[in-house]
């Protein structure tokens, strides 16, 4: 009987040892499985990020592909506008030429508008350093300080991105008159 009890104890110890080894192995495998799942999720997330970035790059390429071309056309628009500004509508000798230039400019502007190229003509608006470049400041009591008084050259936006800033004259508040020597005393 004592031998049977010893055998049972040995079997229990062996089973416990084998059970501990199996439990340890199961825990290791569960940890490996969790790590593999985490790695797979990270790989999927990385793939989605790469795909999203590629789509954004393609979208930007389509959206701003005309940027250089549009920049090169802006001096042509400026020249047509300058021709209209310096020609007289009453002069019979240039009336037909002026009408042709007006139509050409209108067609040109309509075409550029179709491709989301917008003019920035800020006359009378508050100065915006993101879209305007101040060429000079001028005292003026009739308008709010930091308002655009004059536009030397229109600016342009392509799909909301600044292509060229508007060159402007900005108002400033009139300076107070310097007191004379007699007023100081």
From Swiss-Prot:
Give the matching Pfam families: GrpE
According to its record, what are the GO cellular component terms?
Answer: cytosol
Q: Name one GO molecular function term.
A: unfolded protein binding
| Phosphoprotein in keyword set | no
Location in or out of the cell: Cytoplasm
The entry's keywords = Chaperone, Cytoplasm, Stress response
Basic and acidic residues compositional bias, start-end:
1-12
Positions of the UniProt region annotated as Disordered:
1-22
> What are the BP-aspect GO terms?
protein folding
Q: Which InterPro entries match?
A: GrpE, GrpE_coiled_coil, GrpE_head
Q: Which domain of life is it from?
A: Bacteria
Q: What's this protein's family per the entry?
A: Belongs to the GrpE family.
Subunit structure, as described in the record:
Homodimer.
What is its biological role?
Participates actively in the response to hyperosmotic and heat shock by preventing the aggregation of stress-denatured proteins, in association with DnaK and GrpE. It is the nucleotide exchange factor for DnaK and may function as a thermosensor. Unfolded proteins bind initially to DnaJ; upon interaction with the DnaJ-bound protein, DnaK hydrolyzes its bound ATP, resulting in the formation of a stable complex. GrpE releases ADP from DnaK; ATP binding to DnaK triggers the release of the substrate protein, thus completing the reaction cycle.
What is the name listed in the Swiss-Prot or TrEMBL entry for this protein?
A: Protein GrpE
Name its species.
Pseudomonas putida (strain ATCC 700007 / DSM 6899 / JCM 31910 / BCRC 17059 / LMG 24140 / F1)
């Amino acid at each position: 009987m004592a031998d049977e009890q010893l055998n049972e104890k040995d079997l229990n110890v062996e089973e416990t040892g084998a059970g501990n080894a199996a439990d340890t192995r199961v825990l290791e495998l569960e940890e490996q499985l969790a790590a593999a799942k985490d790695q797979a999720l990270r790989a999927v997330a990385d793939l989605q990020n790469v795909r999203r970035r590629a789509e954004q790059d393609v979208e930007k390429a389509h959206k701003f592909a005309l940027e250089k071309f549009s920049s090169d056309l802006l001096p042509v628009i400026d020249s047509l506008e300058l021709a209209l500004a310096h020609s007289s509508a009453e002069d019979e000798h240039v009336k037909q030429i002026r009408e042709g230039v007006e139509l050409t400019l209108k067609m040109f502007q309509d075409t550029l508008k179709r491709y989301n190229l917008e003019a920035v003509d800020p006359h009378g608006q508050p100065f915006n350093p993101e879209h305007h470049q101040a060429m000079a400041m001028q005292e003026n009591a009739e308008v709010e300080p930091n308002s655009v008084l004059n536009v030397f050259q229109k600016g342009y936006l392509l799909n909301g991105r600044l292509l060229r800033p508007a060159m402007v004259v900005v108002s400033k508040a009139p300076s107070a008159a310097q007191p004379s020597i007699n007023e100081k005393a």
